[in-house]
């Protein structure tokens, strides 16, 4: 099992665009083989910050996800619209 916590910090004027595109990404991602969880969150104190909690059956499933057209579309506009993007791996303790 692969657990990822992703932080996406939108440029303040691009918050709604990132939110819209992120929700499209979620819909497509849940159709993928190996996706156990792909849940987006928006910070209450800083609405331009989004968090994704992802669980994949294997790293190979996640790598295949990163090569899909919907992920490539989402990543294509990062330079102009995203201030920060960070991916962290986590290990379930229990």
PLM region spans:
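Short, glycine- and small/hydrophobic-rich beta-strand elements in well-ordered beta-sheets
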Residues: 27-49
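Short, surface-exposed ligand-recognition loops at beta-strand->loop->(often short) alpha-helix junctions
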Residues: 10-15
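Short amphipathic alpha-helices within nucleic acid-binding modules
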Residues: 16, 57-67
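Absolute protein N-terminus
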Residues: 1-2, 94
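Glycine-rich beta-strand-turn "strand-cap" elements at beta-sheet edges
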Residues: 40-45, 75-94
């Amino acid at each position: 099992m692969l657990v990822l916590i992703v932080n996406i910090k939108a440029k303040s004027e691009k918050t709604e665009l990132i939110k819209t595109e992120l929700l499209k990404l979620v819909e497509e991602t849940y159709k993928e083989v190996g996706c156990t969880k792909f849940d987006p969150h928006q910070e209450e104190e800083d609405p331009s910050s989004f968090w994704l909690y992802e669980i994949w059956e294997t790293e190979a499933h996640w790598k295949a996800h990163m090569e899909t057209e919907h992920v490539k579309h989402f990543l294509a506009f990062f330079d102009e619209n995203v201030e920060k993007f960070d991916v962290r791996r986590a290990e379930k303790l229990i």
